[in-house]
């Protein structure tokens, strides 16, 4: 047992409240991510044959559809039973729970619609946008951390793991099959876990942004950047999932692979197809 585990920082997840309305840090992170995407897109608008107003329209509706799709995807993929017993659960976005894969589908619908409306190829638009998506992903993962959700798997042999108050129930269940960790639990009343939200922030936010923007500097055929994004995100997500605690209602499939990893495999395969067929 180590004595260097990190404590989850104590703070109020609510920034301020006015009557029944409360502004949460979680939601603010998504807005900051969207702001950076919007700001960067306007600065880069000359890279695509669309004016600033059209780019703004695409981004506003893509962001809205990403939120809707992300929430619906989360409920469908991870909380199917919950919606039957508590239909209003889908609207409680401040409690966390967004699916990237659902959000991606929502954004694709918006981009497809505007590609037809503005007579601009779908992959021209998506290639223009994907180098900026890591802004949203990175800040979204910070939001997950602030919300104290999506924590990692138990690890007592690594100093920079963290004690998450929200993991208490899962820690108790984990002890049933791992009684040798009882002394750790007795001392901290929690089990140390990987800070998987910050791992994902680095992989899906910082590293993905750097790689995509390096490749974008060299002229690529249409569809190439979109394919590269799908391959890289899918690969980084698969890596991160090995450190992230599987959703308790789903667990690991075949005792090894998570749902997030399964959903990422088609992304990688389609990304390869896009790159091979890019023109």
From Swiss-Prot:
Alphabetized UniProt keyword annotations: Cell membrane, Membrane, Transferase, Transmembrane, Transmembrane helix
Cross-referenced PROSITE patterns: LGT
Enzyme Commission number(s) of this protein: 2.5.1.145
Compartment(s): Cell membrane
Spans through the membrane: 22-42, 58-78, 89-109, 128-148, 195-215, 223-243, 256-276
Annotated positions binding a 1,2-diacyl-sn-glycero-3-phospho-(1'-sn-glycerol): 141
GO molecular function: phosphatidylglycerol-prolipoprotein diacylglyceryl transferase activity
One Pfam family named in its UniProt record: LGT
Membrane topology: Multi-pass membrane protein
Gene Ontology biological process terms from the UniProt entry: lipoprotein biosynthetic process
GO CC annotation: plasma membrane
Annotated pathway: Protein modification; lipoprotein biosynthesis (diacylglyceryl transfer)
InterPro entries linked to this entry: Lgt
HAMAP family membership: Lgt
Listed NCBIfam families: lgt
Function: Catalyzes the transfer of the diacylglyceryl group from phosphatidylglycerol to the sulfhydryl group of the N-terminal cysteine of a prolipoprotein, the first step in the formation of mature lipoproteins.
Family statement drawn from the similarity comment of this UniProt entry: Belongs to the Lgt family.
Protein name: Phosphatidylglycerol--prolipoprotein diacylglyceryl transferase
Gene: lgt
